[in-house]
Amino acid sequence: MLSKIFTVAVLSAVSAAHAQTAPSSPLSFRTVKLEAKSCHGKDQENKPICHESTVTYPITGNRHLDNWVRKQFHGTLPTQRSVQAKLNRNGIVKYTNQENPQDMRKGEPPCRLQFADEWSLGGYTPNYAVFRHDTWEFACGPRGNGNTELFVLKRGAAHPQPVKLGNILLPNQKAKLANLLKADYVKYLIEIARDGKQEASEQETLETLEYVNGRFGNGFQITNNWRFDKNGLTFEYNIGELGTYAEGGPELTIPVKDLQGII
């Protein structure tokens, strides 16, 4: 999880490359949550078959940042009415309502759909704010489908735009960053394989590194989902983005001491 207020250590590292005056007033973590439900028929136990949708958005109290959030909804913030109307019009909902009676006649349980479109303020420093966008859809398969996006915005700008990782990296440092992330990913895979029971042997470490190199070669995939963290820079990967579903979606953190000369 993001720290509410990121530490000065990382901020100073970034500010060395981007020394600008920015507001330091606190931001609000208030979040508006809108929920909708659409019911159609009943199941074998005479319980309503309902589909649900959740939409959230933050109100930071900063006009420019809140305007940026509004733009993510095409200029108009959602309302209870609009969320309900969108769920009612959803083509997947209509199709599922048609299929459920047939499935129940076969003795199968009905499908109850779930949707989520959630924006939130993840954290901030005096110079930057990090927004999080989580989407989720469960359509009655073996598992749901989720996705996370992170957006780092420069505070103080009238029309803020997401800061790209390349904007804070020093020249020719991408490969070094990739190697640091790869090393942390190897540690992550070893930890989940051993479930923290004991230290990995040198042989296990070499085998895991060989497995990762077989997938990525000499490089490594650097995600656009990065954020400032109290310990350094953290890169969040979606489930399955680097490997199998079972390997999960790791959060790889490069500590401040290793960022020297990179940002």
Q: Can you annotate each of these PLM segments?
A:
Residues 1-8:
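Sec-dependent signal peptide recognition
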Residues 10-19:
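Hydrophobic h-region of N-terminal signal peptides that target proteins for export
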Residues 20-263:
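Compositionally biased intrinsically disordered regions enriched in Thr/Gly
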